[in-house]
Amino acid sequence: MNRSTLLLLLPVLTGLISCDGSDSTVSQDGEATPLILASQRGDLKTLAALLGQGSPPDVRDSCDWTPLMKAALNGHGAAVDQLLAAGATVDAEDKGGYTALMLAASNNHARVVERLLTAGAMADHQEGTQGWTALIWAAKQGHRQTLETLIRHRADPTLKDFSGRTAADWARETGHSGLVSLLEAANSGSSETNR
């Protein structure tokens, strides 16, 4: 892995390792969170049992991650569906402002991205550390299918991150030239819609 790729992944990797040095499967009050573990693993049987026993679907770990975020990050679509049906907050944010949609997009889980958008996730939410959106994540990582899904759901290609770069700028900078034309076409389409 080269240095620029590592720098791109650093915010997510830091969150995955742990945001404060503690076990991220432990809730803020120190209690074990089996629902988060089941969601992370995509263990549908355990997930159904825990939700059926009244486990709150938006329990948080020490990094403010929810079960929905863990399921989305790992591409567990059926777990995402179960959590949403149980009332999980689709746009819950972690300590950095990341949402389940961003985490799914960063790992190219296009079907999970589709599910979250259909459930009402905000396509253009910007996280608080770099100002990245799900579309910027998909463009930076070269995730064509996820990028196309986001564009279909009208994600705004003109949004800029805190450094002033758009998704097309990131695609170009990270060597994903095939995505630049898609983003530019979406950009011209959104410009015409806004007239």
Predicted regions span which residues?
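Ankyrin-repeat-protein effector appendages
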Residues: 2, 11, 19-34, 119, ...
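Ankyrin-repeat inter-repeat connecting loop/turn
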Residues: 57, 90, 123-124, 157
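Conserved ankyrin/ankyrin-like repeat signature
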Residues: 46, 78-79, 111-112, 145-146, ...
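Start-of-repeat signature of ankyrin repeats
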Residues: 31, 64, 97, 130-131, ...
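Ankyrin-repeat boundary/linker signal
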Residues: 27, 60, 93, 126-128, ...
